[in-house]
């Protein structure tokens, strides 16, 4: 797809909004920043809002080209500064899922276009899907992400309104992420509760023919992993996580690893099998118990708590990283890191939600290919199931290992 380079701030049209004004959109009276013509929605308990911190990732709106309350098309430009002490940093870079979340101002755009005068507090925003393409490497501390987000159109299915969008993310004029075919809907509580989930069955899917399936580089691939073992992996202690056969990991100084602490979205791996799964090419299953006190419910969104699908995607990438490391693919790659395969489009679909009342998320990796080449790469379908409902699916996601600082 054509990539649009974000114009310089000075030439961008329309109103500008500061971080403080974004906080008002997230948790205050929206008419205070959009003007008195929006006062009619201030009384609604639930509105389409930007997230509150910590998930308010946009730092400023640098331009807005749209007719307020028109429910037509429009464009919004935002920036996100990746501070050196940002809470989400992993290996000095923004995680792939958090990077998608930073392009969150489609929420502010559709709000400015007047969606809540139609929702009237009875309907809430939920992402339905999009197509991602990463470019080059994940941005790092000190970079500023510049987003250009377009509202492309609207539709209606019965009482459900649909919203279509796309966006580009650039750093210093260089494309780093393209999101195409973005779809969101505005749903009642009843409609969300009656969701049939993602219509995808691995038994009916058709993975690629003649797959590249490099064998494990260790004899003893662990079949299960506890939370304490996953914490060890996040801490860079490869042997403490995976055990016998991974002794060489003790020599690593910057081993490829996953995020830890609150950014680790897995409690345990219940199955890891290089010959498992319905395709016989490899399988991993992990679980995460949900608590009402989980940090991501706080402010995402005000009066409408739900787990961002972008963080479910981040959890999926963690399961892929664990699978690659469990096969021994990182043993000889001290100083490397995980990142999405660039210049390939990945399709995400969301059809369920994680609420404070949810009990468990199951993450599954259905391996399609394992390629132990110059940049070891895993391709797999990813499925998240929430209390039995298939909530999230990504088709043929690609994750690879690349040299990190100081090797890059």
Regions found by a protein language model. Name each.
Residues 344-346:
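N-terminal export/assembly segments and adjacent metallocofactor-ligating motifs
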Residues 1-97, 118, 122-123, 133-141, ...:
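Non-catalytic linker/capping segments at the edges of enzyme domains
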Residues 138-146, 312, 354-362:
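Short nucleic-acid-contacting surface segments enriched for D/E, G, S/T with interspersed K/R
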Residues 96-118, 310-313, 317-328:
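Beta-strand/loop-rich accessory regions of lumenal/periplasmic or secreted enzymes
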Residues 148-149, 364-367:
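Glycine-rich and small/hydrophobic secondary-structure elements
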């Amino acid at each position: 797809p054509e990539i649009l380079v974000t114009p310089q701030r000075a030439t961008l049209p329309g109103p500008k909004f500061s971080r403080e004004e974004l906080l008002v959109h997230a948790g205050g009276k929206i008419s205070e920043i959009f003007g008195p013509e929006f006062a009619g929605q201030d009384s609604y308990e639930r509105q389409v809002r930007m997230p509150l911190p910590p998930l308010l990732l946009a730092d400023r709106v640098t331009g807005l080209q749209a007719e307020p309350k028109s429910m037509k098309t429009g464009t919004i430009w935002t920036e996100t500064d990746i501070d050196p002490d940002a809470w989400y940093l992993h290996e000095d870079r923004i995680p792939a899922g958090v990077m998608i979340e930073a392009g969150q101002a489609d929420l502010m755009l559709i709000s400015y276009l007047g969606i809540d005068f139609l929702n009237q507090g009875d309907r809430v925003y939920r992402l339905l899907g999009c197509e991602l393409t990463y470019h080059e490497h994940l941005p790092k501390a000190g970079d500023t992400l510049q987003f250009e987000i377009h509202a492309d159109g609207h539709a209606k299915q019965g009482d459900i309104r649909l919203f279509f969008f796309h966006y580009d993310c650039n750093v210093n004029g260089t494309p780093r992420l393209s999101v195409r075919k973005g779809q969101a809907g505005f749903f009642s509580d009843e409609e969300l509760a009656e969701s049939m989930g993602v219509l995808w069955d691995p038994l009916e899917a058709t993975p690629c023919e003649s797959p590249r399936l490099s064998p494990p580089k260790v004899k003893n691939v662990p079949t299960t992993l506890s939370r304490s073992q996953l914490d060890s992996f996040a801490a860079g202690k490869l042997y403490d996580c995976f055990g016998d056969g991974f002794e060489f990991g003790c020599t690593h100084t910057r081993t490829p690893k996953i995020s830890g602490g609150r950014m680790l979205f897995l409690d345990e791996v219940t199955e890891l099998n290089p010959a498992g799964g319905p395709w016989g090419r490899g399988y991993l299953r992990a679980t995460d118990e949900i608590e009402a006190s989980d940090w991501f419910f706080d402010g995402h969104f005000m009066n409408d708590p739900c787990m961002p699908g972008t963080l479910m995607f981040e959890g999926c990438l963690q399961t892929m990283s664990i699978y690659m490391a469990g096969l021994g693919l990182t043993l000889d790659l001290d100083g490397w890191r995980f990142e999405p395969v660039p210049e390939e489009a990945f399709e995400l679909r969301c059809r369920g939600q994680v609420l404070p009342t949810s009990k468990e998320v199951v993450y599954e990796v259905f391996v399609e290919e394992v390629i132990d080449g110059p940049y070891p790469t895993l391709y797999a379908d990813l499925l998240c199931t929430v209390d039995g409902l298939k909530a999230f699916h990504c088709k043929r996601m690609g994750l690879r290992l690349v040299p990190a600082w100081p090797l890059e």
